Amino acid sequence: MRRPAAADRRFYDTEFIRSYGRIESLRAARYNTCYSIVLIDIAPPDGAGDVYDDIADAVVSAVRSCDVTGEMDGEHGEGRRILVILPETDFFGTLLTIRKLSKSLDPFLSSRALSIIFSHATFPRDGKGFGELLSRAARLVAQKRASLWERLNLKDKLFWEIMGELSSTPFSGFANSSFDAGSGLPLSEFFVDQAGELIVNEASRSPQKRGILYMASRKISSSLPILKSLGLAGNVATRVFLVGEGGPDLQEIKNATPVPLADPRLKEFSFIFFLSEDSGYAVICRECWGDTFSCFHTSDQMLVEGLITKFQGEYALGEQLG
């Protein structure tokens, strides 16, 4: 097996990556641990040109010394792809790695007409061997390119720009749709509260599964319905954050983390962002008039993760996930 460039680059060819991936699968199965892969898809296929080596070097520099990086030739005429193998890394650890990689590769996107998609898969939840993980990650590339996050170019917009666009644009479909809620409508003005309770109830059915939930309303209070649901759920691995204007009883909230924000836009918007290993869900409701709300909801995991990333970044909340 050969390296395509200087030995100290730690950037390997496809043959080496495939062999190492098979070995990592055997090791993880033997020791009952996990590992993940990140597949980096660069479009258009010839767009990287002479900066491909620079992109590869940036990826190697961004990941850990124990991670293995190399070129992954497409089997069906895909463009140039880079693959990173992340030993002992779970789903949420992989998302944090992708955030770091995205920041490292941003300069290449601004200087050239490139589109870079980060896909991923984790052993054993997404496959029992390296080949299955790679197939899963390759399918996810196509799904991510079809996501609203990519189609509307939301990565380059501010958080509240995105919120305004999603809540004011009509969407219809299985993954993304718009609806109205409020007084006199089939869905009540308490729809967001009800959605939050349903998510907590779902999390309680698999309490060991990690997740992250942001729920934003005008004011944080110990009387919020979701807190009662959390109390009944017991210990769950989903981390719950309540966002809004801080009230006098914040110290009474024991089973969620208050995030006090004195932002007037939270008087107009309420939202839920929920991301777990298995699914993602977001609902955004914007107050209109007469106790009615214009709402948008989605099960697009890439869009949900993007919204969480934007929200955490613009309010300096750190890069915590589940």
What would you call each of these model-derived segments?
Residues 150-322:
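PLD/PLD-like phosphodiesterase catalytic module centered on the HKD motif
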Residues 17-47:
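Active-site-proximal structural segments of metal-dependent nucleotidyl cyclase/transferase enzymes
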Residues 36, 67-88, 110-140:
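A short glycine-enriched loop-to-beta-strand structural element that forms part of the catalytic core
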Residues 14-21, 91-106, 122-149:
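Catalytic-core segments of nucleotide cyclases and related cyclic-nucleotide turnover enzymes
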Residues 3-25:
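Short coupling/linker segments associated with nucleotidyl cyclase/phosphodiesterase signaling modules
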Residues 45-52, 80-100:
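Short helix/loop segment flanking the catalytic signature motif in cyclic-nucleotide metabolism enzymes
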Residues 2-8, 115-130, 143-168:
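Flexible, glycine/charge-rich interdomain/linker segments that couple
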Residues 17-20, 43-68, 104:
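Active-site-proximal alpha-helical element of nucleotidyl cyclase-like catalytic domains
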